[in-house]
Curated annotation (Swiss-Prot):
GO terms for molecular function: ATP binding; cAMP-dependent protein kinase activity; magnesium ion binding; protein serine kinase activity. This is cAMP-dependent protein kinase catalytic subunit beta. The modification Deamidated asparagine is found at residue 3. PANTHER family: CAMP-DEPENDENT PROTEIN KINASE CATALYTIC SUBUNIT BETA (PTHR24353:SF150), CYCLIC NUCLEOTIDE-DEPENDENT PROTEIN KINASE (PTHR24353). Residues 44-298 form the Protein kinase domain. PROSITE patterns: AGC_KINASE_CTER, PROTEIN_KINASE_ATP, PROTEIN_KINASE_DOM, PROTEIN_KINASE_ST. Activated by cAMP. Its cofactor is Mg(2+).
Amino acid sequence: MGNAATAKKGSEVESVKEFLAKAKEDFLKKWENPAPNNAGLEDFERKKTLGTGSFGRVMLVKHKATEQYYAMKILDKQKVVKLKQIEHTLNEKRILQAVNFPFLVRLEFSFKDNSNLYMVMEYVPGGEMFSHLRRIGRFSEPHARFYAAQIVLTFEYLHSLDLIYRDLKPENLLIDHQGYIQVTDFGFAKRVKGRTWTLCGTPEYLAPEIILSKGYNKAVDWWALGVLIYEMAAGYPPFFADQPIQIYEKIVSGKVRFPSHFSSDLKDLLRNLLQVDLTKRFGNLKNGVSDIKTHKWFATTDWIAIYQRKVEAPFIPKFRGSGDTSNFDDYEEEDIRVSITEKCGKEFCEF
């Protein structure tokens, strides 16, 4: 690298440092003083279910006053308690209302009633990366790299705030109208300065240290990035089997096989991300994220341009109008039932 290039790199590193310092200040203000609830169920017209989970659903809604479309996540308090997800749910809201990054879905409103908790997010009509990946089969390396770069920047941002994401997978990545990623579902995100021990995540994406019940840190997100890049470029994840236990055996074995079409740079990056030895895993070494950002596979990536959303996306999802749901699957519709008496008031008093 010439002197000019070295100087440019140096000033970029400095401006990233400044950016993250300011971002932390903004985050901490909101983290320490979370925004009060600012809406109610009656403010929204419910349109269609976009997804369902073990303790709730996500619906497309229309805000009556502004006619804007949003995605409303509805969590049944009693089910959250039964599934021991109180802490996770409180984390999700507290984190979402405090973060601000181009590739994170925005929380616009939140509130609760006798039965449910509600989080109203911007609606991303392009649907999940998962459905596009399954339809296309696999993404070319440049296509996969475009998405991977956004996740790298997002993790750099989150980790600088001491946040671990813990739930990276194609189902949680929405493709917006410009073809960029919106990370959704902060149900497992957590603010951790040292290590944490909770077993959570999705089997195919779990890092070995989580499976082995060791204390773990932010490095689990970099492992998951390796799994995601592999799955985007191959069309299937690096470790898969019928039963979770068989998946776990493969993950901890430290053996990965690559399709013959993977470039040597891609294989090299993945060997460093899917590295069982934490003292060798990229993202977890003394240079931190820069080992990943300066890796040969990312040589053509203009990190600033990606952050500024100036790079042309490889794929723009098709949709007609802001309330179109054609990129989401159909689900059975169910009424939202609200009890006349308060449920689990104590558990969720801080929501």
